[in-house]
Amino acid sequence: MSVRLVLAKGREKSLLRRHPWVFSGAVARMEGKASLGETIDIVDHQGKWLARGAYSPASQIRARVWTFDLSESIDIAFFSRRLQQAQKWRDWLAQKDGLDSYRLIAGESDGLPGITIDRFGNFLVLQLLSAGAEYQRAALISALQTLYPECAIYDRSDVAVRKKEGMELTQGLVTGELPPALLPIEEHGMKLLVDIQHGHKTGYYLDQRDSRLATRRYVENKRVLNCFSYTGGFAVSALMGGCNQVVSVDTSQEALDIARQNVELNKLDLSKAEFVRDDVFKLLRTYRDRGEKFDVIVMDPPKFVENKSQLMGACRGYKDINMLAIQLLNEGGILLTFSCSGLMTSDLFQKIIADAAIDAGRDVQFIEQFRQAADHPVIATYPEGLYLKGFACRVIVM
């Protein structure tokens, strides 16, 4: 008999709507013993079967659902089916947009909670973020090897969230050859170098692909400030869009060095690109105090909020940094501003920008809205999957 997680009375509603998480407060009891990440059955208070998921006793998310199909086992065949289903959409996108790199698995939205897989050419970069994902590591890798024999697999599960579920951080080659120090990929006509082994996340922010392309429409003959530039994707796109100058700011000299290489790799005019190692908050104040002005500012900060207790502080951070950006823009200038914090809703983020404009003594018009690229889908039953949001704002004086 399988181990069963029994829900408290009335706590089955989210599962009936096919939401993939069971929180600790919804659990009445466990029937049997399960190890970390083991597959269990989830039933309502009367014993009616609801779902099959992975057990995580140390997490607030006590179980993550693998399947709502009673007849479906969690095995190599299960992972193969999920991977093949996800690949169909990525194949279409890759063909339409000319991509050689994309997010293959976007966790819950692809029916594989806690699993992220990015494909960069013939390298699959894996992040296992939950106990259940780690427990199923061997089955997942077996499925990947069968479906993608041409690909090497590299593990970047060196993510702090694993500690919340009682797991160590892991990183290293799984199968195949080690990725090069810098792997060239292609995106909307750009060549970009990706550091799979040591870069942020899996090496590159694929989710901002469409936003980088959209930037080009605003930058012709403009002076651009690219904040939190990382390896310069927005800077390269701005140069391809015909900007007069782009200033890229980041605290990492290693990232800025790659950004410079990316400009050179695309045979763009390096004299139009400036790379500044500095704290963005500090530098924006310095620019303001000495009267610097820009026509376009890209504001793409790291996640400011990890949990609800940090949300108020994050709101202040987003407000301050956008206020400074708005102050630096010429009249008619464009602010392209983003938040990758899942707890920050689009409505709240828009309100923060509006408040920032008031504090800056300017008016802004919202002219375009952004979200994560289409290889990062959001399944309807898991709205939390929409984490990246952004706006193009035009600064005016009424």
From Swiss-Prot:
- The superkingdom listed in its UniProt entry is Bacteria
Keywords for this protein: Cytoplasm, Methyltransferase, RNA-binding, rRNA processing, S-adenosyl-L-methionine, Transferase
Q: Which InterPro entries does the entry link to?
A: PUA, PUA-like_sf, PUA_sf, RLMI, RlmI-like_PUA, SAM-dep_methyl-trfase, SAM-dependent_MTases_sf
Q: Where is the PUA domain?
A: 2-79
Q: Where in the cell is it found?
A: Cytoplasm
| GO terms for MF | RNA binding; rRNA (cytosine) methyltransferase activity
Q: Which reaction does it catalyse?
A: cytidine(1962) in 23S rRNA + S-adenosyl-L-methionine = 5-methylcytidine(1962) in 23S rRNA + S-adenosyl-L-homocysteine + H(+)
EC number assigned by the record: 2.1.1.191
Which Pfam family is one of this chain's hits? Methyltrans_SAM
**According to its record, what are the GO cellular component terms?**
cytoplasm
By sequence similarity, the record places it as follows: Belongs to the methyltransferase superfamily. RlmI family.
| Function text | Specifically methylates the cytosine at position 1962 (m5C1962) of 23S rRNA.
Q: What is this protein called?
A: Ribosomal RNA large subunit methyltransferase I
